[in-house]
Swiss-Prot record:
Protein name, UniProt field: Charged multivesicular body protein 1b
Name of the encoding gene: chmp1b
The species this protein was found in: Xenopus laevis (African clawed frog)
Entry's Gene Ontology cellular component terms: cytosol; ESCRT III complex; late endosome membrane; multivesicular body
Compositionally biased intervals (Polar residues): 170-183
Principal subcellular localization: cytoplasm
């Protein structure tokens, strides 16, 4: 097995691993949704909110893994074409040196940077490249949009046949509009003030 064939194998393996991670996130999301229902049934809105945030975070992370899996898979196909056509250049050989460790790390930002280098090299070989959306760094934040959390809480409450509107702060039960954003900002300010008072 040549060096490039070995790297090609590793790319395909990494794509499968990323896909596996996406499925794991999907499973975790379902688990968190079940916990939301239980918490709502017990009247623990704050606990339900935490599980809703976790569910949305798992969903976003799963999407990120799927996107990166597709991107790595696309690069693997390009490597396969380049190997088949004998168009592997010296500059390409330089890019693959750090590949194995990067792919094994399952670090989305590092893999994304590696894919950037590969895609740049293939552009110079006149192989068409299709960029995915902006790299994962902006979407892997720890914060979750509150309107998504609130929507998920209501969805789980509806599925459980419960009324959650009495327990949520006013202004977050209807359609999400500009007033919700200001209400959320006010809530954040109040929570921050309470934290300061406790210190």
């Amino acid at each position: 097995m040549s060096s490039m064939e070995k790297h090609l194998f590793n790319l395909k393996f990494a794509a499968k691993e990323l896909n596996r991670n996406a499925k794991k996130c999907e499973k975790e999301e379902k688990t968190e949704k079940a916990k939301i229902k239980k918490a709502i049934q017990k009247g623990n809105t704050e606990i339900a909110r935490i599980h809703a945030e976790n569910a949305i975070r798992q969903k976003n992370q799963g999407i990120n893994f799927l996107r990166m899996s597709a991107r790595v898979d696309a690069v693997a196909a390009r490597v396969q074409t380049a190997v088949t056509m004998g168009k592997v250049t010296k500059s390409m050989a330089g890019v693959v040196k750090s590949m194995d460790a990067t792919l094994k790390s399952m670090n989305l930002e590092k893999i994304s940077a590696l894919m950037d280098k590969f895609e740049h090299q293939f552009e110079t070989l006149d192989v068409q490249t299709q960029q995915m959306e902006d790299t994962m760094s902006n979407t892997t934040t720890l914060t979750t949009p509150q309107n998504q959390v609130d929507n998920l809480l209501h969805e789980m409450a509806d599925e459980a046949g419960l009324d959650l509107s009495m327990e949520l702060p006013q202004g977050q039960t209807g359609s999400v509009g500009t007033s919700v954003a200001s209400t959320e900002q006010d809530e954040l300010s109040q929570r921050l003030a309470r934290l300061r008072d406790q210190v």
